[in-house]
Amino acid sequence: MRMWKWLAVVALSMAWTLAFAKDKDEIKPAGTSNPPPSELLSGFDRYEVKPAVLTGVYAGQEINETALASFQRNFDERVGAWVAEQNARPARHDPARTLVIEPRIDKIRFISGGARVWAGAFAGSSRVLVALRLVDQATGEVIAEPEFYQHAKAMAGAWTFGVADNNMLIRTATMSLDYLKANQDQAVGAPTGWEGK
């Protein structure tokens, strides 16, 4: 019985620490909308997708690397599948023009399923800021660098035992694909996902 009481005290202590600890970095995009690319993306014949990476202090942390792997799977399912379709089409330029897509997670606070089970909503909210660097392979010119923000509120994460936390990674992958599609024939940019809250 004493062991269970001790575990309960430890779990509650961890929960309160997580609940009231301040993030080292504020996780949010520069604004509510991404600017359009410097040229129409339909001007490229081929797409080369680089593996997603974590930047700065977020790299090398086990929970963040787990989130990165989940994001990569969802990115491959969405953007990767679309790129395969585009690359199967005949090229309109000779030589073919290639757009390099470099996804990265700039900032993240990811609450694992285990933390949700132990601490629930006390573990806090998950947040992620993803960026896409779109580069003309031939010239090295950066065509666009949109960013996408999503979060999973603490209570949503608790009620779903972490499903909501993982869903934010799916949404950022979907937003990445939406940007690539929306800016093919007209340069319109796209929302960042930030609602000012």
Show the residue positions of the predicted features.
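Bacterial N-terminal signal peptides that target proteins for export
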Residues: 1-8
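Bacterial N-terminal signal peptides
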Residues: 8-15
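A structural "domain/chain start" motif
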Residues: 19-77, 178-197
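Surface-exposed short loop/turn segments
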Residues: 24-27, 86-142, 152-163
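Generic beta-structure capping elements
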Residues: 50-52, 106, 148-151
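Short secondary-structure boundary motifs at beta->alpha junctions and helix caps
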Residues: 58-65, 140-182, 186
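Alpha-helix N-cap and loop-to-helix initiation/capping positions
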Residues: 67-71, 120, 164
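A short, N-terminal amphipathic alpha-helix
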Residues: 75-85
